[in-house]
Amino acid sequence: MPDIDIDFADRTKALAILKHIDARLDTDKKHNTGVYCTSIPHNPVTNISTLDYKDAESRGYFKIDFLNVSVYDGVKTKEHLTQLLDKEPIWELLEEKDFCDKIFHVNGYHNLISKLKPRSVEQLAMFLALIRPGKKHLIPICEKNGFKSIKDDIWQKTEESYFFKKSHATSYACVIVVQMNLICEQLTDLTD
C-alpha cells in the first residue's frame, strides 16, 4: 500500500475540519501523525484505532500522515511557493555548517553533505535517501564515485531497513529548496 504524507504549516487546522480517527502504534499509544479518514475499529472515547497501524495496513486500512512542516510558515501565497520552488538555490550554502544545521532533514549531516556536494533536486533526493538506514551502505560508493554511481541502487526497495522511496525523497528535496530560498529571501529583505 502506498505511503502518503501530507505536509501542513499547521496540521491541526486540517484535522479540525476533517473527520478522522487517530492511528495507533504497536505500543498502544497514539501515532504522532497518522490518521484514518475512513471507518476503522476504534475506541469512541479516545478516537484512536483499536488496531495498530501495521495490523490495520495488513487488513487493508489506509493511513495518511498529516505532518507539520514549519518551513511553510514563510510562504505567503501559492505563487510565492512556486517562485521559491522554481528558483535555483545556492547549493554551496549546504556546505556551510551554520546554514546546513538550519535545514530540514539535513541538519546534523554537514560533514557528509560537504563531501557529496549535491547540486540538483535529484542529487539532494539521493542524499536524503542515503542517510536512511536501508541505504547507508551506499555512502562510501557515492563518496568515491559520485551520485551517478548509486542511481541504480538508491531507489531499489529494501526489506531489512527503513528507506526513502524516490517520490518521498524528491518531495522533501523540494521542501529543502523552498527552505533554502526562503532563508536567502529573508536575509535579502533584512539588508534592503
Each language-model region and where it sits:
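Mg2+-dependent phosphoryl-transfer active-site scaffold
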Residues: 1-192
